[in-house]
Amino acid sequence: MTTKAALVALCLPGMAQAVTCRDDIFEDASYSVCEVAPGEDLRLFLNGPDGPYGSFAALVTGLEPTGLTLDFAMNAGMFHEDLAPVGLYIENFQQKARIVTSDGPGNFGLLPNGVFCVGDSFAVIESRAFKAAPPACRYATQSGPMLVIDGALHPSFARESDSYNYRNGVGVAEDGRAIFAISNDAVNFHAFARYFRDIVGVKNALFLDGSVSRLYAPELDRDDIGFPIGPIIGVVTAKD
């Protein structure tokens, strides 16, 4: 089965799940992809009672008293040494960090950057457009650069770039699914963006981070560990 055929098959009636994860290959590089159906309980997490969670294990433990199970999670944007978000961060409608629209150093400042918003639907929105007309986001995280903007690759990406890294990002399909991908091999931005546009098939996609990229996906037996991370995005369900 081809990659695109597999994506279609996952969306056939009667086969829908809250989160569906799979492994994939694109241009000899390995990727893991998790798709979140519209209406699922997708949340952002940063702090627990004792400070930043910093890891999937701490988040799983923190959710236990609430009766919720973590079905999928991924690091969700760049952060400072104290794990605070670099850009806009909204949790349960409360803005915890402001939006940053000026250019600057590093990947975050490589404009255009963008915001992933969880509201009545999922959306990836360029940061300045978001600031000009902010939607109602229950959760939102800003990162950068944008990978795909209205079907076009970020103008700064070069196919021949020798900047290779592990990377993760998110895009939104036309049917409303949020599609998260992480590279299991080092890839450059051009390849990563083309994977989202040409294989995943989204018109807008946002880079979340690189090198610290992590995935929690029990379906794939993934529970990545490493240095502490800042914002975490994940799907939760009530325990049976």
For the regions a protein language model found, what residue spans apply to each?
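Short glycine-rich loop/turn motifs
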Residues: 29-33, 112-113, 164-169, 229-230
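Short acidic-glycine loop/turn motifs at beta-strand connectors
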Residues: 36-39, 117-122, 149-150, 172-176, ...
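Conserved, well-ordered active-site substructure
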Residues: 86-102, 156, 160-166, 172-204, ...
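Active-site-adjacent helix-turn-beta-strand microarchitecture at beta-sheet edges
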Residues: 84-157
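Sec-dependent signal peptide recognition
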Residues: 1-9
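Zymogen propeptides
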Residues: 17-107
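Hydrophobic h-region of N-terminal signal peptides that target proteins for export
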Residues: 9-18
